[in-house]
Amino acid sequence: PSGCGKTTTLKMINRLITASSGRILIDGEDIESIDKVKLRRNMGYVIQQGGLFPHMTIRQNIEIIEKLEGKDEYQILKNTERLMEMVDMDAEKFLDRYPSELSGGQQQRIGVIRALANDPDYVLLDEPFSALDPLTRSSLQDELSDLHRKMGKTMIFVTHDMDEAIKIADRICIM
């Protein structure tokens, strides 16, 4: 239900807020002992309606963390092209556009691949498909499942839709 703490839980996992009690462990390590920047750069985060930076091109949105990390420009470009291909979007056609020039489904695809661009071990998804039409939503659910299988990431997916949870998840926690 609304207000039960789903989004708050994601924010605690990536240390945007501090838990009032208890501990959160990742691979047996308390997240409070992990440097916040290091923790967050090892976590992709996808929010409802993409959360793309409107003043940046699609390329800039996808590549921002890799550039902050100082990765090789050629490798960044190749990774961006590979990720675009994985979600069936033509890099030449879309990378120089701005988020406002994309449909809602395209923006969500970019949000997902931006979360994956720095090759994080974990991806947090906070109702990423809730504002989309049923056909786009179903298509993105399938694409996310395929990405999960191909990339082998731990994904924590928040949704109000039990059918969506059953379709995507291999484990479900009900709050």
Where are these regions (language model features)?
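ABC ATPase NBD coupling module
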Residues: 31-44, 68, 73
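Conserved H-loop
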Residues: 152-158
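Short helical segment in ABC ATPase nucleotide-binding domains corresponding to the A-loop/adjacent helical element
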Residues: 59-67, 77, 81, 170
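Catalytic Walker B motif of ABC-type/P-loop ATPase nucleotide-binding domains
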Residues: 123-126
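Helix-to-loop junction immediately C-terminal to a conserved catalytic motif
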Residues: 14
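Conserved signature/switch motifs of ABC ATPase nucleotide-binding domains
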Residues: 97, 118
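Conserved ABC ATPase "signature" region
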Residues: 74-93, 146
